[in-house]
Amino acid sequence: SIFWMIPRLFLKKLGEVALPTAQLCKDIWASEKTFAWQIHKSLYDAAQDLNLNTELGEIAQLAQRCQGDRNFRILSYNYDDFLEQYLDFLNVRCCSMFTTKIRYSNGRDSADFYGMNGQPNQSLRLYHVHGFLPKVATRDQLDTLHMRSICLTEADYNMLYNQPYSWPIASQLSFFRENTCLFIGCSLSDPNIRRLLEITAYNLPKHYAIFSMTYKSTDAHGSTTTKQLTSKDRLQIENHFYRIGINILWVKDYREIPVWLHNLNQSIV
């Protein structure tokens, strides 16, 4: 986590909420490159070797099976290039897409810049709508456009979601309107994403999200236990997400997601 250096008093005041805490990190690390490098370290320092039996490995294999379908594309809210690494391992041609604002020397904002690796019409399209920070060896190798693509702080999100015609917003609306989406590893708690889903919701939900039937519960003494949702809990959650166009697919716990995805892969002819 990039938050480990934040004094506990500040975290207590902020309630350890991600957006204002990220904003505080950016305020402390005033240098754009220093802040981006801290994010980079939090993403890649503990990275594990590629394993096709993991969630990302199965997603990459699913993409490999579907790469010939021009309607198949991937939207990621992650900043890392782990999925790209898996796709490269499987020889799947991938176009990583992101956007940022660049500033001219006279202080005027330019139009949106779209960064892409490869040609979107000739490869799988992977949309990084909250920014893209691929792995590099050293701090000095960080690319300015990648650094300025990151949407992480309170100010970043406020600016992004107050621009209804921006590329990230238009891309998400396009996905939600034109595709049947499967949400993997996404809690769907972000109010901005929920608002876009609600805007595009139809009479019958057409999207799907994988949720776990178990959850972590912490008591007053700080002890954590694993509990299971009751059938009533699950029904209430299903009804809640039905309103914004989401059907819930239940697994016993999140460790089952790779198995679920593997079975989906095997079912595709």
Question: At which residue positions do the language-model features occur?
Answer:
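Metabolite-binding pocket within alpha/beta catalytic cores that recognizes anionic/polar moieties
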Residues: S31-S96, T100-K101
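Short, solvent-exposed loop/turn segments at secondary-structure junctions
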Residues: Y79-F82, F132-V136, S187-S189
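Active-site gating loop/helix substructures
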Residues: R93-F176
